[in-house]
């Protein structure tokens, strides 16, 4: 399975619509690179992870959207999400949850608008740093 190709199929048209560039980080992670931010989508045995990358003063920061969502979501917001068996279903479920949890802020993220109250910075791997920083700096 090629995770990059799967995401490319799922989000066909997003690159042009939101002026983003889909970039492969590794076999299990891709990023949509915008003008001064990137939205990472990772795949693991635990499911799909969503990350927000921001370049401030030449320092790349990474934030887990999952951690923010888990704190903010209620049982009602998760209602109607069916168990997923394919990458497509998993990503779509995450995006539905993201839309509900952030009151449609996912679309804002795709346009480069930031969410407030980030306090959960995560470790940025060297691979993420080199690929995403290069992508952000060349835009």
Walk through the language-model features, giving the residues of each.
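Intrinsically disordered, low-complexity regulatory regions enriched in serine/threonine/proline
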Residues: 1-10, 22-139
């Amino acid at each position: 399975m090629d995770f990059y190709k799967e995401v490319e199929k799922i989000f066909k048209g997003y690159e042009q619509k939101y002026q983003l560039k889909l970039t492969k980080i590794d076999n299990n992670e891709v990023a949509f690179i915008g003008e001064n931010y990137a939205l990472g989508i990772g795949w693991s045995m635990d499911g799909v992870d969503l990350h927000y990358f921001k370049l401030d003063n030449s320092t790349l920061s990474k934030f887990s959207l999952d951690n923010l969502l888990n704190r903010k979501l209620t049982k009602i917001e998760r209602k109607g999400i069916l168990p997923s068996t394919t990458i497509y279903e998993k990503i779509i479920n995450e995006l539905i949850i993201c839309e509900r949890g952030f009151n449609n802020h996912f679309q804002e993220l795709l346009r480069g608008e930031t969410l407030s109250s980030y306090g959960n910075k995560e470790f940025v791997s060297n691979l993420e740093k080199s690929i995403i920083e290069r992508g952000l700096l060349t835009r």
